[in-house]
Regions:
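Active-site glycine-centered loops adjacent to acidic/histidine catalytic or metal-binding residues
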Residues: 197
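Metal-cofactor-binding active-site regions of metalloenzymes
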Residues: 1-192, 201-215
Length: 215
């Protein structure tokens, strides 16, 4: 069994669905909260780890957004990305397509540039250090309104040559894909590829909308 595990670890791999903010390890969350003097509702790494025993999407999103609050600087986003790429490299990863949620950060007052410049720096360093290539996919938060997603797409314009596509994530109930038809059309017009989460919590109609309206 150990030989099989070693063999599998050594195989070249591509990770095509990774939410970078969701890769924040408990140790990193605790360290970043101290570094940036950001309060979190946990007293130890062990408490954070225990909070990851979620039973539904919303429970996961609650701790996901709590963790995102500790990300304050370009250095934080760079370190977050590098830590992920180090783990990916150790598992034989050669390529990754990374989702990031700029509205998670701009909605709490960070400039758009902080997150994307930090992530791009981490991606560049990971390629130089580990030979791991990567692409960036910008997600819109479906619990926010269409105006917020259109504003985010506008803010992303200086970096469109570094963004491979757009996605749609966060709380699904009550937020059908059709809510974002205009922003996805605008993204396509800018040459961005399209993807979207659908059907995790919502009805089958949401899957149809993602395929028929957002495509």
């Amino acid at each position: 069994m150990a030989d099989l595990a070693t063999f599998i670890r050594g195989l070249p791999k591509a990770e095509l669905h990774l939410h970078i903010e969701g890769s924040l390890e408990p140790e990193q969350m605790f360290a970043f909260s101290r570094r940036n003097k950001v309060a979190i509702p946990f007293g130890s790494v062990e408490e954070i780890r225990g909070a990851y025993a979620f039973s539904n999407l919303q429970d996961f999103l609650d701790i996901y957004y709590q963790g995102a609050n500790v990300l304050q600087t370009e250095e934080d986003f760079r370190d977050l990305a590098l830590a992920y790429f180090e783990r990916l490299h150790a598992d034989g990863g050669r390529h990754a397509e990374i989702f990031f949620d700029p509205e998670t950060h701009t909605d709490r007052g960070l400039p758009f540039s902080i997150a994307i410049e930090g992530l791009l720096a981490g991606m560049k360093e990971a390629e130089a250090r580990y030979g791991v290539t990567s692409k960036l996919i910008m997600c819109f938060l479906r619990h926010l309104d269409e105006a917020s997603s259109l504003k985010t797409l506008k803010a992303a314009e200086p970096w469109l040559d570094r963004i491979a596509g757009v996605g749609l994530d966060s709380s699904e109930k009550g937020h059908p894909p059709s809510k974002f038809a205009r922003v996805f059309q605008a993204a396509r017009e800018r040459g961005l590829k399209i993807c979207a989460h659908a059907g995790e919590e919502g009805p089958p109609a949401y899957v149809h909308e993602a395929l028929d309206i957002l495509r």
